[in-house]
Curated annotation (Swiss-Prot):
GO biological process: gluconeogenesis; glucose 6-phosphate metabolic process; glycolytic process
Family: Belongs to the GPI family.
Pathway(s) of this molecule: Carbohydrate biosynthesis; gluconeogenesis; Carbohydrate degradation; glycolysis; D-glyceraldehyde 3-phosphate and glycerone phosphate from D-glucose: step 2/4
Record's catalysed reaction(s): alpha-D-glucose 6-phosphate = beta-D-fructose 6-phosphate
Keywords: Cytoplasm, Gluconeogenesis, Glycolysis, Isomerase
GO cellular-component term (any): cytosol
E.C. code: 5.3.1.9
Protein name listed in UniProt: Glucose-6-phosphate isomerase
Length: 562
């Protein structure tokens, strides 16, 4: 399903660079990082790149200069640069939904111009940001009052997918900068436990709900929103939820919406003056820097939020202008293709050495897997190569005592990104010993060194280890890693990191010739669930027409749920 004005692209596997990489891989398959570093004492100084405040050391990858040359040639032959320029120009590169892809416009500075269908969307974005700022300032100042006259002290964001993962990740990452007088909670799961536990200790009179749903019809989000409305009304005035005349002015003080569906927002009882919109050219997983980030703006303030946007924009500009050889998203993207398509790596770990980034791997999981988990090309043809990997991770050093064993000595190749900061936000000395941050970063540097170089049998034997134990103490090494170093975790650097990975995912999707901006795989389960709900709720035994397994599961659930 391609733009009829563009010629069909040759199959990825037929591109000259791909064919050259296949041959080159045979010479690289067994080359060890020990040998690559021994042959080039300056390798760790040469194979680095820097942009927008991010320092990338990619020297511990199983590549040579020739590998990198061929990978960048593949990016060029696959049209990465042209597709990048088309995205920034507002062309409708999301072909299956006939939409532009312009999350970059969300962080364009005031006065910039990005036109979609004759409209400068940057001006619209700035207008929404100004409204968000005014609202956030009132909540933070205590002048936005609930229905009983109390100031708001609790903010509960209700959303799912991109309407939840982005805000909760960013809030946790920037909690150091948050107004601690405010309590922020995030509800996403339709499991009632999520809402019950998140509201259990809150005073309804001081609680504001942000309902984030573009259509205001998302099943899980609206179920949670309706239950939250009932909780609020019961806790304030014991007003029946259906008594709209009494309930509406109460709801309007305790609910705001991030949506584009004014009719549904008003039907719910929210004043549309308190509705903050966004656009169909913003995908959910790319929306944390839109009105979806309202909870974050309330937490860190409008100035902090604009710093957050400035970080995104800095990486956007780097991605647009840096030569491919020094372009951070391109380098990360092509290295990922190298391991996914030539080494057959099925998974990829993101390992932030900062506790504030605990939710960052989960956020990237959606960003990457929902974007590039595709099995057909833009033309609708089945791919004959692997696409998106499984993305996962945990903050260091926790992961070292959980799954690093498999990365070091298991039989599965798992490329890793290590993320660290030179300065900590919470300096904490260890009495009589090194600081906590030095301990943390020493572990990060040690892990990348150990993964790269391992420990040979000869080294183990030289330590006097018993012969029967020696094989167990061998580390093969040759496990590839990237290390990303930044000075300090701030709203700006977080925005930069998010944009870096957004564009890395874009680069890989462009090379694989897939649409990174739809998510049809999410839809089928939702459709089937909507058919099963009435069967679960039916007073009598429903006629079930599913497969035998699903029918049996439904019957067992109905029989045992009470």
């Amino acid at each position: 399903m391609r733009d009829s004005s563009s010629p069909a692209r040759p199959s990825l596997t037929q591109l000259p660079a791909w064919q050259a990489l296949k041959s080159h891989f045979e010479t690289m398959r067994d080359r060890h990082l020990r040998d690559l570093f021994a042959a080039d004492p300056r390798r760790g100084e040469r194979l680095v790149a820097e942009g927008a405040g991010v320092y990338l050391d990619y020297s511990k990858n199983r590549i040579t200069d020739e590998t990198l040359r061929l990978l960048l040639q593949l990016a060029r032959e696959a049209g990465v640069e042209a597709r990048r320029d088309a995205m920034f120009a507002g062309e409708r590169i999301n072909l299956t939904e006939n939409r532009a892809v312009l999350h970059s416009a969300l962080r364009a500075p005031r006065g910039a111009a990005v036109t979609v269908d004759g409209t400068n969307v940057v001006q619209e974005v700035q207008e929404v940001l100004d409204r968000m700022s005014a609202f956030a300032d009132r909540v933070r100042a205590g002048t936005w009052l609930g229905a009983t006259g109390k100031p708001i002290r609790n903010i509960v964001n209700i959303g799912i997918g991109g309407s939840d993962l982005g805000p909760v990740m960013a809030y946790e990452a920037l909690k150091f900068y948050a107004d601690r007088r405010l309590t922020l909670r995030f509800v996403s799961n339709v499991d009632g436990t999520d809402l019950v536990e998140k509201t259990r200790d809150l005073d309804p009179a001081e609680t504001l709900f942000i309902v984030s749903s573009k259509t205001f019809t998302t099943l899980e989000t609206m179920a949670n929103a309706q239950s939250a409305r009932a909780w609020l009304l019961a806790g304030l005035e014991n007003v029946p939820d259906e008594n709209a005349a009494i309930a509406r002015p109460i709801i309007s003080r305790h609910f705001v919406a991030v949506s584009t569906n004014a009719a549904e927002v008003e039907r719910f009882g929210i004043d549309t003056a308190n509705m903050f919109g966004f656009w169909d050219w913003v995908g959910g997983r790319y929306s944390v820097d839109s009105a979806i980030g309202l909870s974050l703006m309330i937490a860190i303030g409008p100035n902090g939020f604009r710093d957050f946007l400035a970080g995104f924009h800095a990486m956007d500009e780097h991605f647009r202008s840096a030569p491919l050889e020094q372009n951070l998203p391109v380098l990360l993207g092509v290295l990922g293709v190298w391991y996914r398509n030539f080494f057959g790596a099925q998974t990829y770990a993101v390992l932030p050495y900062d506790q504030y980034l605990a939710y960052f791997p989960t956020y990237l999981q959606q960003l990457d897997m929902e974007s590039n988990g595709k099995h057909v090309t833009l033309d609708g043809q089945p791919v004959d190569y692997d696409t998106g990997p499984v993305v996962w991770g945990q903050p260091g050093t926790n992961g070292q005592h959980a799954f690093y064993q498999l990365i070091h000595q298991g039989t599965t190749l798992i490329p890793c990104d290590f993320l660290g900061f030179c300065q900590t936000l919470n300096p904490l000395p260890t009495p009589g010993g090194p600081s906590h941050h030095d301990l943390l970063m020493a572990n990060m540097f040690a892990q990348t060194e150990a993964l790269a170089f391992g420990k040979s049998l000869e080294q183990v034997q030289a330590e006097g280890v018993a012969a029967d134990l020696a094989p167990h103490r061998v580390f093969e090494g040759n496990r590839p890693t990237n290390t990303l170093l930044l000075d300090r975790l701030t709203p700006r650097t977080l925005g930069t990191l998010i944009a870096l990975y957004e564009h890395k995912v874009f680069v890989q999707g462009a090379i694989w010739n897939i649409n990174s901006f739809d998510q049809w795989g999410v839809e089928l389960g939702k459709v089937l669930a909507s058919k099963i709900v009435p069967e679960l709720e039916a007073p009598g035994e429903p006629e079930l027409k599913h497969d035998s397994s699903t029918n049996a599961l439904i019957r067992r659930y109905r029989a045992r749920r009470r």
